[in-house]
UniProtKB/Swiss-Prot annotation:
Superkingdom of the organism of origin: Eukaryota
Phylogenetic lineage: Eukaryota, Viridiplantae, Streptophyta, Embryophyta, Tracheophyta
Subcellular location: Secreted, Cell wall
Protein name: 56 kDa cell wall protein
Originating species: Daucus carota (Wild carrot)
Record carries keyword Secreted: yes
Keywords annotated in UniProt: Cell wall, Secreted
Amino acid sequence: SQEDTPL
C-alpha cells in the first residue's frame, strides 16, 4: 500500500 512504500 501507499503506507508501505517510500515512493
